[in-house]
């Protein structure tokens, strides 16, 4: 009988004790969660929890609105 394949659960990078805070002014952090085309990368790829993904999306949208991040990258 073959063993079942168990995928290792990824942990959220923002749930650790010394994890960085999600802030719209931290452009370097936010750029890691935006694709090269300027789209927000989904949480199934980045392993961010649902709550933190919502906070991250809101921070990216804020940074775009005030001009810290571009809406699209050519």
UniProtKB/Swiss-Prot annotation:
Keywords: Ribonucleoprotein, Ribosomal protein, RNA-binding, rRNA-binding. One of its GO terms (cellular component) is cytosolic small ribosomal subunit. One of its GO terms (biological process) is translation. It comes from the Bacteria. Transmembrane segments: none annotated. GO terms for molecular function: small ribosomal subunit rRNA binding; structural constituent of ribosome. Pfam families: Ribosomal_S18. HAMAP family: Ribosomal_bS18. Part of the 30S ribosomal subunit. Forms a tight heterodimer with protein bS6. Belongs to the bacterial ribosomal protein bS18 family. Binds as a heterodimer with protein bS6 to the central domain of the 16S rRNA, where it helps stabilize the platform of the 30S subunit. This is Small ribosomal subunit protein bS18. It comes from Rhizorhabdus wittichii (strain DSM 6014 / CCUG 31198 / JCM 15750 / NBRC 105917 / EY 4224 / RW1). The lineage of its organism: Bacteria, Pseudomonadati, Pseudomonadota, Alphaproteobacteria, Sphingomonadales. The gene is rpsR.
């Amino acid at each position: 009988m073959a063993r079942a394949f168990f995928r290792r659960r990824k942990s959220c990078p923002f749930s650790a004790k010394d994890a960085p805070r999600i802030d719209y002014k931290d452009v370097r952090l936010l750029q890691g969660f935006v694709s090269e085309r300027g789209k927000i990368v989904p949480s199934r790829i980045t392993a961010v929890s649902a709550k933190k993904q919502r906070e991250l999306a809101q921070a990216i949208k804020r940074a775009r609105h005030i001009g810290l991040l571009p809406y699209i990258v050519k």
